[in-house]
From Swiss-Prot:
Its main location: cytoplasm. Coiled coil: none annotated. It comes from the Eukaryota. The keyword RNA-binding does not apply. Keywords: ATP-binding, Cytoplasm, Endoplasmic reticulum, Hydrolase, Nucleotide-binding, Transport. This is ATPase ASNA1 homolog. NCBIfam families: GET3_arsA_TRC40. The active site is at residue 64. The keyword 4Fe-4S does not apply. HAMAP family: Asna1_Get3. ATPase required for the post-translational delivery of tail-anchored (TA) proteins to the endoplasmic reticulum. Recognizes and selectively binds the transmembrane domain of TA proteins in the cytosol. This complex then targets to the endoplasmic reticulum by membrane-bound receptors, where the tail-anchored protein is released for insertion. This process is regulated by ATP binding and hydrolysis. ATP binding drives the homodimer towards the closed dimer state, facilitating recognition of newly synthesized TA membrane proteins. ATP hydrolysis is required for insertion.
Amino acid sequence: MEESSMESDNGLNLRNDVKNLVEQETYKWIFVGGKGGVGKTTISCSLSSILSERRESVLLLSTDPAHSLSDAFNQKFTDTPTLVNGYENLYAMELDVTRVADTGFGLNETKMFLQTIPELFQMLPGIDEALSFSELLQSVQSMKYSVIVFDTAPTGHTLKFLNLPDTLDKLLESFLKVESLCGVAMKLFSALNNSLPKEEIFQKLKRFKSNLTLIMNQMKDPNRTTFVCVCIPEFLSVYETERLIQSLAKTDIDCSYIIVNQVLSYINLEEHVKNTQNSLENLSPENKKVLDCFFELVLEQQNNLNGRLSIQRKYIEDIKQLYEGFFNIVAIKQYKYEVRGSEAIKEFSKALLKHSPIPDS
């Protein structure tokens, strides 16, 4: 058995790297999600980079309104798939799901539908985003890429997406209730506002829901779709990761990878400082005073770092207790440099393929 592979009590073959993930050729959609600021985009880019070496064609699609793909690759991306510099088969695009009907991506059905239904239904919470995302995934489904990696919006947006079937059910229910309570007024309202007839509105909503059901069937197929959770060892991130994992489990969407990013390493410089001070005993009092001040600052920074590390270790222990033995957990150390540009991403991606267990607390 390889060093990075272990069999859990429940028979799962778990690893502390992403080799199984990137080598499973049946995957069509890989979603990467988590709290904002935990490094989702860097992980998404790195996974896409690795996949481009194994698959015929890869699309990296950002649905995060903040859009960091352009920053990560040092290259401007739009709502049209664009070849990433330094690659032959990796494409990237950025879409704002909350405004996707206004983009040039071709989601005209949602835009036209929202323009023709009564304003009463346009005000229903989540209708624009729900319908836009439904049509977006329909369009993505027809794209001819071997695999698509989704750099998703922060957890709250992702949870809203997972609740889309329920949202559309509620929209249909609301439509029927309002229509039954004030059918005559609805007809007059539609006539005055050039809205679609109620029967056509109802049928379109049903079609959106039917299409979304087909999409969710692919989402729930563990051979075609999986979700990668990214977190850092801090309270809010671990909390949101648990929320996301629970929601994925509730909707029967596969999630077997957790990447713990920005993990700090313990340092101890006290012995080095002491030895250096002893070797400099012949210095003048003035110079020795200056160096003592410097060493004091060094030890202060060490204590600050190790204090933060102690906090991280608490949440690393929580991660181990919650997920060890059930998930592939990969720990990525705090990177020394900013990860920007294709070469930096290729270098960073090597860490995902190495045996990287979470450290002992």
